[in-house]
Design a protein with these regions (language model features):
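N-terminal nucleophile
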Residues: 1-201
Length: 201
């Protein structure tokens, strides 16, 4: 299982700690004992909701936002791989053939690229290119988002945690595709037909 988060750092860390402690203390219900990924997502959601309510109760008179969201993905032996988006309220939705991806955090700059280019049948190689361009667009448009980018690719039925890869500022491949993307956009814009005269009246 892989769990990603965005939002209030204290809330996210508290959720991770509670989930980890449940495993270490061999509690009856933890991420190692739940029968399905849906149950795992429900467990994360419950933990998130409890953590948020507790934090808000302590800091009633402040304007601090304690909201965090999570993406849970992975595979349980004998079942299909799944990805769940867990909202700050604790409820969750599953990725489907119609909505094959989720995003966390600052997504408005990169999401249009994924919406235009990605579908359920896309290859992993194509998906990787689109994801990296999506990150590049976000990094260029929002100063609060930056390198590195951590990449983790899970292969169906491997039941093994991937090693993962960290892309930093000196990564040659990332530099190459972001330059190709910028050049390609300018080229396409220059090739588009000029707007009609009526647009300029």
């Amino acid at each position: 299982l892989v769990l990603q988060t965005a939002g209030n750092l204290a809330t996210s860390q508290a959720v991770f700690t509670k989930l980890d402690n449940a495993i270490k203390l061999a509690q009856e219900r933890n991420l190692h004992t739940v029968p399905t990924l849906y149950d795992a997502a429900q467990l994360v959601g419950e933990c998130l909701r409890e953590t948020t309510i507790h934090a808000q109760t302590i800091a009633q008179e402040t304007d601090t936002k304690f909201r965090s969201s999570f993406i849970l993905g992975g595979q349980i032996k004998g079942q299909s791989p799944e990805i769940y988006f867990i909202y700050p309220e604790g409820n969750c939705i599953r990725a489907t053939t119609d909505t094959p991806f989720f995003q966390l955090g600052e997504s408005k700059y990169g999401k249009p690229i994924l919406d235009r280019s990605m579908n359920y049948d896309a290859s992993l190689k194509s998906a990787m290119r689109a994801i990296l361009i999506s990150f590049d667009s976000t990094i260029r448009s929002n100063l609060s988002v930056g390198m590195p980018i951590d990449v983790l690719v899970y292969h169906n039925d491997s039941l093994q945690m991937p090693q993962g890869y960290r892309i930093d500022e000196n990564d040659e491949y990332f530099a190459s595709i972001r330059q190709h993307w910028s050049d390609g956009l300018r080229k396409i814009l220059n090739e588009l037909e000029d707007s009609p005269v009526s647009y300029w009246q």
